[in-house]
Amino acid sequence: AAKTFAAHGATVLLLGKTEEYLNEIYDAIEAAGHPQAAVIPFNLETAQPHQFEELAATLENEFGRIDGLLHNASILGPRSPMQQISGENFMRVMQVNVNAMFMLTTAMLPLMKLSSDASIIFTSSSVGRKGRAYWGAYSVSKFATEGLMQTLADELDGTSAIRANSVNPGATRTSMRALAYPGENPLNNPTGEEIMPVYLYLMGPDSAGVNGQAFDAQ
């Protein structure tokens, strides 16, 4: 998504815990001649509330405002019966997939209110819209994602130029998909680049006024 947004003129802020991976994306964006990105190492699993506020202050000083926020970080957690999931594993999934997403969103809202056209995209899942056995904490976290999106969208409706929507990527050629379905041929699934149209639509001005909706990328 970052490379696609950059190719359409966005100045992308790459936030995540694996700096080496972020640098690879940064280099690809630079090599393509797109607007210079920024790398922000940040561990969503261990970050405390005050660190999200400090991040927002840093970004305000560096960039002034935020026009778009894509929540794309998730961990799968154990795929097993609920009774067999440890409290530690459940809380870890909820921390990355829900708590950190909430704190990052609320920290960024003041910067997004400075934009005349701002968009928040929450990455959901089919198991966040209909529960399925053995999807455990991941399914619960994606239901929470949809709930956060809907609640925030209703609060923003008519009060802000910010819109919030969710996207279910569907079966995509990712490492998480391979972990969830180890026997599946990944070549049967589209790449991330192939499901970008809905993300571009929601992040761009064409979706102004579209708020509180759940989209499927496929």
Regions found by a protein language model. Name each.
Residues A32-Q48:
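Rossmann-fold cofactor-recognition segment
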Residues S125:
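Residue(s) in the substrate-gating loop at a strand-loop-helix junction
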Residues T105, S141:
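Active-site helix of classical SDR
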Residues L55, S80-M82, N89-M91:
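Substrate-binding pocket helix/loop in short-chain dehydrogenase/reductase
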Residues K130, T151-I162:
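Active-site-adjacent segment of SDR/Rossmann-fold oxidoreductases
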Residues A1-L13, K17:
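Canonical Rossmann dinucleotide-binding motif of NAD(H)/NADP(H)-dependent dehydrogenases/reductases
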Residues G158, I162, S166-V167, T174, ...:
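C-terminal helical subdomain
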